[in-house]
């Protein structure tokens, strides 16, 4: 089977990318520490045997480290250089500024530290006020990246899906589009209540207790055609590069150490 055939077989699949469940669990734990939530009981199941009453809230150690790291990395604007093409350099710098990337990078770095990375979706419309649009997407919630099972650097298909409020319809809707190197696929929006009541949507996000649109059988393709770019316009940026699909968050390996600091104090 060719890579194009493998990618085509993934269109509108109800299967999830390998490792996504693991990533969601890791990100949920990291977000709990960052939001200074009370500790979920399962955090202690492997070593906390004594009963000390109500579980304590997370101290702001992890949050402070991540905030400082993000500001250190992207507190100063990046400079884009295209030595062999000054016109392209001027255009990219203008698009970078109009997409407010200088301010957004700090927030993206914080999100990547918690989720293990971030995805950037690029769109081009020469008639738009900002022809080159850069959209940042959560690897946990808003994008599904399917890779060649034999090469974790070869992306076969990217699915972008997220909820939004439709003011005309007066309800929350779900948006979906998919990309392979050969095809661009768009779907009709789906109302949130359709996902909630569908028997095919029984699976829920373990971390967020909400319906998973990946399992919904009612998605209908509204348009499907050739990819005008010849490549998938999604960049997967890992927070820390590792030899797997998703990389790692800044403090994933240290949260259990922080537990041992928090509990004696609280």
Predicted segments with their positions:
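Extended, helix-rich architectural segments
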Residues: 1-155, 163-165
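Generic hydrophobic, helix-prone segments enriched in Leu/Val/Ile
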Residues: 69, 108, 112-113, 176-177, ...
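A short, polar/proline- and glycine-enriched secondary-structure boundary/capping micro-motif
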Residues: 142-146, 167-174, 219
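A recognition module on extended beta-rich or small alphabeta surfaces enriched in W/G with H and D/E
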Residues: 169-185
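Extended, non-transmembrane interaction/recognition domains
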Residues: 182, 189-201, 205-216
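Extended, charged amphipathic alpha-helical segments
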Residues: 209-266
């Amino acid at each position: 089977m060719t890579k194009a055939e493998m990618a085509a077989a993934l269109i509108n699949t109800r299967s999830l990318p390998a490792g996504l469940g693991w990533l969601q669990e890791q990100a949920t734990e990291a977000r709990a520490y960052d939001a200074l939530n009370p500790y979920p009981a399962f955090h202690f199941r492997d070593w906390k045997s004594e009963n000390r009453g109500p579980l304590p809230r997370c101290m702001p150690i992890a949050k402070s480290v991540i905030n400082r790291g993000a500001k250190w990395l992207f507190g100063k604007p990046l400079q884009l250089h295209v030595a062999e093409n000054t016109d392209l350099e001027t255009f990219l710098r203008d698009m970078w500024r109009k997409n407010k990337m200088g301010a957004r990078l700090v927030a993206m770095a914080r999100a990547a530290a918690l989720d293990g990375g971030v995805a950037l979706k690029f769109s081009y419309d020469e008639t738009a006020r900002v022809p080159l649009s850069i959209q940042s997407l959560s690897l946990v919630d808003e994008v599904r990246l399917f890779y060649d099972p034999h090469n974790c650097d070869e992306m076969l298909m990217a699915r972008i899906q997220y909820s939004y409020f439709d003011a005309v319809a007066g309800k929350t809707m779900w948006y979906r589009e998919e990309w392979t190197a050969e095809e661009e696929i768009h779907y009709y929006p789906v109302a949130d209540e359709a996902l909630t009541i569908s028997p095919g949507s029984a699976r829920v996000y373990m971390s967020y207790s909400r319906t998973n649109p990946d399992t919904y059988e009612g998605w209908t393709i509204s348009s499907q055609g050739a990819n005008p770019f010849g490549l998938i316009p999604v960049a997967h940026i890992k927070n820390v590069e590792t030899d797997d699909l998703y990389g790692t968050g800044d403090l994933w390996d240290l949260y259990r150490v922080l537990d041992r600091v928090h509990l004696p104090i609280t």
